[in-house]
Amino acid sequence: MAAAPSHPAGLPCSPGPGSPPPPGGSDLQSLPPLLPQIPAPGSGVSFHIQIGLTREFVLLPAASELAHVKQLACSIVDQKFPECGFYGLYDKILLFKHDPTSANLLQLVRSAADIQEGDLVEVVLSASATFEDFQIRPHALTVHSYRAPAFCDHCGEMLFGLVRQGLKCDGCGLNYHKRCAFSIPNNCSGARKRRLSSTSLASGHSVRLGSSESLPCTAEELSRSTTDLLPRRPPSSSSSSSSSSFYTGRPIELDKMLMSKVKVPHTFLIHSYTRPTVCQACKKLLKGLFRQGLQCKDCKFNCHKRCATRVPNDCLGEALINGDVPMEEAADYSEADKSSLSDELEDSGVIPGSHAENALHASEEEEGEGGKAQSSLGYIPLMRVVQSVRHTTRKSSTTLREGWVVHYSNKDTLRKRHYWRLDCKCITLFQNNTTNRYYKEIPLSEILAVEPAQNFSLVPPGTNPHCFEIITANVTYFVGETPGGAPGGPSGQGTEAARGWETAIRQALMPVILQDAPSAPGHTPHRQASLSISVSNSQIQENVDIATVYQIFPDEVLGSGQFGVVYGGKHRKTGRDVAVKVIDKLRFPTKQESQLRNEVAILQSLRHPGIVNLECMFETPEKVFVVMEKLHGDMLEMILSSEKGRLPERLTKFLITQILVALRHLHFKNIVHCDLKPENVLLASADPFPQVKLCDFGFARIIGEKSFRRSVVGTPAYLAPEVLLNQGYNRSLDMWSVGVIMYVSLSGTFPFNEDEDINDQIQNAAFMYPASPWSHISSGAIDLINNLLQVKMRKRYSVDKSLSHPWLQEYQTWLDLRELEGKMGERYITHESDDARWDQFVSERHGTPAEGDLGGACLPQDHEMQGLAERISIL
């Protein structure tokens, strides 16, 4: 309900026909309220105020201002149309006087003097009123004693106590805890205070509208009735003896800020409630002793499991009490804070729509990775960071084949015997047939070929040859053993057993993502495709099979991670290359799927050349497919493929500037990437100076400018210390990651040793920047890295401050970026205002080469750039 003017007292009211005139205008307030008076001559101007189909006969005192009339109009709206009022109504209305003699019937009232006796004044809503204004209607909360059990309409929990258990809104009648008052959105409907538009404000009788049929109201009545509708304020010390306490909801400015936030699906987890709680979707009690319902991990929304699918995607992120703290209250790091990470997530089941547990430990083992010798300083060489997973798994419900198998590989010629279990996604090598602990997983998506035995060079002397080979990108597995035990026996040997495994694996390598899921005996198999959502044109189609729109290549794996596998594909009609991210609901129940949903919800709200484009999404009962544009490679491949294992400064400036521009767009939308690393910076082409785009928003969070979060996210090697120390973080988290990316791009190593304190390492310049290779890198680059790798968040550079750093404000970089914008046909990195500055820079430096000759200004790096371009084109 709208906050009406705070000074309604003294507002005039309309006289009624036949009422005796008062002795003077000053005595109007002293008369009984039930005896309204007709004003004496000279005491004011009487006229009608019309709002829609409602008219009120009012009196404007002499020497009144236009503000007086607006206050009166707001009071009428608050009483007769409370559901139409909103915060700031006074500043959003215009007054027009009806003038039948003019060609323009409505004349704008600019001052109170424009209103004459008997005029009809129309109240019109200004065009400056926005949709957000209509959504802000503060509650009028008073302490209330309930005679029957009641529940809070904000958190769903029961209002406990014998008397004065909670707060009731006088406008809409909803009930709240006192502790929830600050969190209550200003969305009062005003249903309890609404009056019929045909009812006069001064009378309880219903009357028909007429030119003078409305009974007048005294100023005292109008003041009292209007005050009843205003949001309450806490009583002052002078009124401490009052029997009622008054409360207001959360600040209006907070509501305006929250309306601009991107809304995402709720993160539901199964929850056990210790207090009686109602479902906030259906308003019915959550019954049971434990695991009664679902609770959103971020906003604490409660609902039944059956109601989860009907809950709108309107989560605004973590509530203030659950992690967002004002920036000025955030403390710097102390030794006491450096404790081990605590696991925030429950071990209970998770339902669709929930975010996955974020693994934050280094990989426990990597078969096939050659150990690179570290330098004497103990620097960690740059590599693709692999998130660790617990080496346990549940038995798949779609097991295709299982049994004991003997095997060895080209990396390890020692024969091993494990219990293999093949399902539709991978081959799992278990320690035995009764445990869920496994030795290794071989994803089917990584198997390039299954060939008969042909390479016998690695067969140990005196042993039997293998039966067939499983070839992956890094490892070749030699499976089976020709003579020996019975087929399929516990020894894992035998030609027949090996032949059966070879056939089963070949069948599993077929495009299973396009096949129908195996159905139970007696059940009719159903179609995979059920729903298609097009992001580009917002079209939703049912019963659309993804195979009819896109050709997916299961053997073209573009990447894999915690959130699924990305396959290459092609649009059937246009031949356009695409990337398809797949989540298997059956194998990965809701964890990775929920992160994917969060990524889709965020990408739907983003349209920027520096962010990967989301085309559409398909969902089936078993899988979720997200179709995105296919890019050439990632920034990590570019770094690793360079001749020296690091990038030249010129190219690093070019790439970092693009990353910062994309981050600026994200932060403007209050979105923090939270997992920025070279693997998530994709290259659009094989050019030596390519366009880059940010991807993988599975960890992304919606964080306000002065808000903090505490959820554990991201990849440890690129994470800021506030996350690793389980403290609140904000959008500066991404800026730390940019500093790490700069460091690894210029040096080819990670900046920190995980065994030593980050503070000590940063303060030790000799450790952070050894002579090789940093003696060949400019001091400007080191200065920018130092300002990004600040442990104290308030000292860390922002996006705009980083873009303004002298190291990035370089003429050659500007030329490279302008050339890229010319190829793209869109100017989104540089700005027109920079043109004059750089033109002046060229004119002042007469020795500066022309634009076409600037490529020769960096001769030491040109050889590197040429070699790098050749390697990128091969990737």
From Swiss-Prot:
The active site is at residue 675. Transmembrane segments: none annotated. This is Serine/threonine-protein kinase D2. SMART domains: C1 (SM00109), PH (SM00233), S_TKc (SM00220). Its cofactor is Mg(2+). The modification Phosphoserine is found at residues 26, 30, 197-198, 200, 203, 206, 211-212, 214, 244-245, 519, 707, 711, 873. Keywords: Adaptive immunity, Angiogenesis, ATP-binding, Cell adhesion, Cell membrane, Cytoplasm, Golgi apparatus, Immunity, Kinase, Magnesium, Membrane, Metal-binding, Nucleotide-binding, Phosphoprotein, Repeat, Serine/threonine-protein kinase, Transferase, Zinc, Zinc-finger. ATP binds at residues 558-566, 581. Its EC number is 2.7.11.13. The gene is Prkd2.
